[in-house]
Amino acid sequence: MRGSTKECSISNIYKLDGRVPVSKAIPFGLQHILEMFVSNLAPITIIAGAAQPALSQEQIAMLLQNAMFVAGIATLIQLYPVWRIGSRLPIVMGVSFTFVTVLSTVAAGYGYPSVIGAVLVGGVFEGTLGLLAKYWRKIISPIVSATVVTAIGYSLFTVGTRSFGGGYADDFGSIQNLILGTVTLVTCLLWNIFAKGYLKQLSVLAGLTVGYILAIFLHKVDLSLIMSGGIISLPTLLPFKPEFHLGAIISVCIIFLVSSAETIGDTSAMVSGGLDREIEGREISGSLACDGYASSVSALFGCPPVTSFSQNVGLIAMTKVVNRFTIMTGAVCMILAGLLPPVGNFFASLPDAVLGGCTLMMFGTIMVSGVQMIAKCGFNQRNTTIAALSLAIGIGFTSASENAIWSVFPKVVQTVFAENVVAVVFVVSIILSLILPKDMDIKKVEEKNVDAE
């Protein structure tokens, strides 16, 4: 429900459109950006590292700066739509991990300019799909969305655990990282228990602050890097000339379909967990259109696709802070981080273990939101079959990837599905939703007593 009050009050953080004092809004917006900042940059370093010929450190630094700028702009469009592009919901956008595998393959085989060309085409493909959502929206039934949201929550557990242990650094699992993650997690929990009023919703920011300070004392933060790179630096448009290869484009477009499923799930979870209502068709259409066309814009700045960030969906579900102006302050901080290297360097210096301590609870919240959505759909025979079978196949088959269970399938199928539980759950749940009879409930047979003569 949209807030209608014009009064500027902190209580409006729980309303979509209420006015919030800037000084009160900034901490909540900043909390969102801190939560996703490193995850927004990591895919670029992985994809750029796989590129042949290799990208220079200067080029990678430029792409990281561009990614911050693009993520902020894309978030603003989700919050305040342009025409039919944008959902008008508090969705935070960032560079997607979903594309890392396929884009790393494209970068290694065709070169980084081919990544840009494939993302340009794929983004237009998803954006157009979003604008035409009213023609295919009914295929995505509520039980499909609910099951996908549950799968998204599950798929993020390993991401949170990886961050908790220190990310992809050589000291993964070290005692220092485990202490950092634990202290951050406990701080979030204690703040959530003992803080009063609206301050209770700043538990993640409190955890990040305490964890960051502890990381400084443990020498896990290099403060000298914060002022490196100058004071102001404008994003670079078209740093690479796009190249187009049919094989790369087809592979990336397939992953855009998977990303669409995740976006539908994220948007549904945000509306259900943050606004306590069912999602509307225009919101799905606008969200997907923004995902797609913003990804094409991202490619123009040399970056991979952007999409909704599940971490922030979990944060909204946990705090119920849905105010668009509040989230906008975070988007502005992201844009500033792309224009002011010291700001971006500060955010980028957040240790993975600190982020992991904050994300574990939020990722669990996403999964619980999915279960709640399934419960709202009802536990009849049909819904139970769709949810149970799609989750069993999705989790089971992707967990067994190392056992070569996917080896009989073509390479493109392995790339899309072998390690992507959300993609498998989405496809299986769609198929089951289309082919299963509408009424599968077991009917009781009433026996008529016949008097024996």
Language model feature labels by segment:
Residues 2-10, 40-44, 48, 184-194, ...:
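Juxtamembrane interface elements at the cytosolic ends of transmembrane helices
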Residues 23-39, 173-185, 202-203, 218, ...:
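Hydrophobic, membrane-embedded alpha-helices of multi-pass small-molecule transporters
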Residues 104, 192, 312-327, 332-338:
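Interfacial segments of multi-pass membrane proteins
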Residues 1-90, 98-106:
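N-terminal signal-anchor module of multipass membrane proteins
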Residues 106-224, 331, 336-447:
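Membrane-embedded alpha-helical modules
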Residues 62, 84-98, 138-147, 199-205, ...:
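Short, non-helical or kinked segments that cap or interrupt transmembrane helices
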Residues 22, 48-88, 253-324, 452:
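Membrane-embedded helical hairpins/re-entrant loop segments and their flanking transmembrane helices
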